[in-house]
Amino acid sequence: MLGEFKKFAMRGNVVDMAVGIVIGAAFGSIVKSLVDDVLMPPIGLLLGGVDFSDFFVVLKEGVKAAAPYQTLAEAKAAGAVTLNFGLFVNAIISFTIVAFALFMIVKAMNKLRADEEVKPVTTKKCPHCCSEIALEATRCPHCTSEL
């Protein structure tokens, strides 16, 4: 049974999938940082100094301190129950970037794969009239020469 598992785990598809998952996780963290640290601060600045990660609604006030809370960190520190729609907006933007990047990668791979596919030869040229004829033909339909 251990030998079967080793054979399964060492197949090319499983190893490729594992590498893809690890690279995908790393790419996801890069995109998250891009959204949180690079894209959203200028957008927030253009919208009047808004920090999207601090967009939240208090569902239940905390036991340690009463509302209003200026930041999500204050609300969490007070033990408040919050609906964090600003973080959700950030997650949607991250997902969109990752999905678009994957779409572009898959599109490029499909183009490479289509270029690699060689169509089987189904025709040949008649040696007498140089017309395209079926590969299995024994007589040219254009000049009626025997092949």
UniProtKB/Swiss-Prot annotation:
Record carries keyword rRNA-binding: no
Annotated Pfam families: MscL
Predominant cellular place of this UniProt entry's protein: membrane
Positions of transmembrane segments: 14-34, 85-105
SUPFAM superfamilies to which the protein is assigned, alphabetical: Gated mechanosensitive channel (SSF81330)
Function statement: Channel that opens in response to stretch forces in the membrane lipid bilayer. May participate in the regulation of osmotic pressure changes within the cell.
Gene Ontology MF annotations: mechanosensitive monoatomic ion channel activity
Keywords: Cell inner membrane, Cell membrane, Ion channel, Ion transport, Membrane, Transmembrane, Transmembrane helix, Transport
Similarity comment: family membership: Belongs to the MscL family.
Top-level taxon: Bacteria
Membrane topology: Multi-pass membrane protein
Cysteines joined through disulfide linkages: none
Signal peptide bounds: none
Compartmental location: Cell inner membrane
GO CC terms: plasma membrane
Protein name stated in the entry: Large-conductance mechanosensitive channel
Quaternary data: Homopentamer.
